[in-house]
Amino acid sequence: QNFITLAQKGFYKNLTFHRVIKDFMIQGGDPSGNGTGGPGYSFEDELNPATESYKQGYVKGVVAMANAGPNTNGSQFFIMLKDTHLPPSYTIFGKVISGQNVVDTIGNIKTNASDKPSESVIIKEVTVSSK
């Protein structure tokens, strides 16, 4: 619900994908643009191993909350570039249903040693739909 509310309020508009790790994931949603920012609050993890998304795991196209440890979710999220085994510590809340080619293109952008893209990758719009 947090992501949906922020998206509907336009929170993500003009933010960047500040972290790109080839063949792993892209991360965005930080208003400071460096991985330290958020909406001004945090919320608890919503981890439910019984759900289908957790049974499938962190597969290509999955969208999950980025965090700095348990119960530190805010506005930052990541999108998986390929199927990857991760501990179930990140709240999965969606999957890319359109535009995975754009995600893949971002995943191949040149980055510096800190995984920051050499050129800004700006989020123009976030659209949430239910399937």
Where are each of the predicted segments found?
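Cyclophilin-like peptidyl-prolyl cis-trans isomerases
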Residues: Q1-K131
